[in-house]
From Swiss-Prot:
It catalyses: di-trans,octa-cis-undecaprenyl diphospho-N-acetyl-alpha-D-muramoyl-L-alanyl-D-glutamyl-meso-2,6-diaminopimeloyl-D-alanyl-D-alanine + UDP-N-acetyl-alpha-D-glucosamine = di-trans,octa-cis-undecaprenyl diphospho-[N-acetyl-alpha-D-glucosaminyl-(1->4)]-N-acetyl-alpha-D-muramoyl-L-alanyl-D-glutamyl-meso-2,6-diaminopimeloyl-D-alanyl-D-alanine + UDP + H(+). This is UDP-N-acetylglucosamine--N-acetylmuramyl-(pentapeptide) pyrophosphoryl-undecaprenol N-acetylglucosamine transferase. The lineage of its organism: Bacteria, Bacillati, Cyanobacteriota, Cyanophyceae, Synechococcales. The gene is murG. One of its GO terms (cellular component) is plasma membrane. Pathway: Cell wall biogenesis; peptidoglycan biosynthesis. It holds the Pfam family Glyco_transf_28.
Amino acid sequence: MPRLLIAASGTGGHIYPALSFADSLSNSWEIVWLGVPNRLEVELVPEKYNLIKLKVGGLQGNIFRKLFDLCKLLFASVQVSVLLRQKKINVIFTTGGYISAPCILGAKMAGIPVLLHESNAIPGKVTRLLGRFCDHVALGIPSASEYLQRCRTSFTGTPVRTEFLFEKSLPSWVPLGEGVLIVVMGGSQGAIKMNEMVRKILPCLIEKGCRVVHLTGKNDCFYRNRDQEKSHPNLVVRDFSDEMPALLRNADLAISRSGAGAICELMVTKTPSILIPFPSSTDQHQELNAAYMARFGGAIIVNQHDPEKNILKNIVSNLLDSNSLREMKLNMNNHDYSYPEKKIFEIIHSIS
């Protein structure tokens, strides 16, 4: 049985695509997972994948701290190289982040092929520096190839949970009716500024007969103890929902940040969207992620602004009062973002 090592650690943006890909594989593959102690993967990675934890960090701080971290990186790379030989790993799949660096270097020492997946339109630091040492780099957004001229790249899309791939009925708590269904995804960090923009236009949306599901994120406490402000039958406010596949499959419009995870979920579910990039994202990658969807007419970009301005209100009103939503839906349907897992597996098969 061939053995695949998956190296994914730290944030959901690194872990969830790797989990989705792992779950798509048949039982003919044995999977070993390489992570970091006390990080999110300890909670998320199921027991059926053998999770091995390795202490590693980024190159941060002053020159002396960076030299110390560099020594730790080289030591970790040697550890990975030994591990790969001990576990008789055939091929590696990694999604970037701190754990990827020693994994890529260790694989180079051991002569084991590596497929690196990059979800964002602007590759992360590890991808830019070490992508050239990988046998292939799979891209979630095709424009990322512009930054990886020395790498062998292919556009595959980013894996999502299988639940996003099939039609699903709406949860019972979503307002019933014929009105346009708008799903607002505030993000796990709260997206407080974006939520403020959306709250300002809620009266307009309700007046136009829209049904609104506002997922604020756990850090936005505006609605707590303000039940009178979320009591309209066509408005549902929640911190989060684990039924995102059903919500996006049935939504007429999403209002969202433009992280890589949100982009791939919107693409797979063919959901037209208004994207509000987080202005402080690393390298402004959310702006370029959003530009990918806007380029073929699947999304409209609205920069974060003072809620008192009417920019978001005017754009939403225009969408609701015209055929633009229908045209955006057609554009989404005509854009191929299907079967990322299958495309990634084909690359893994070709390099292993």
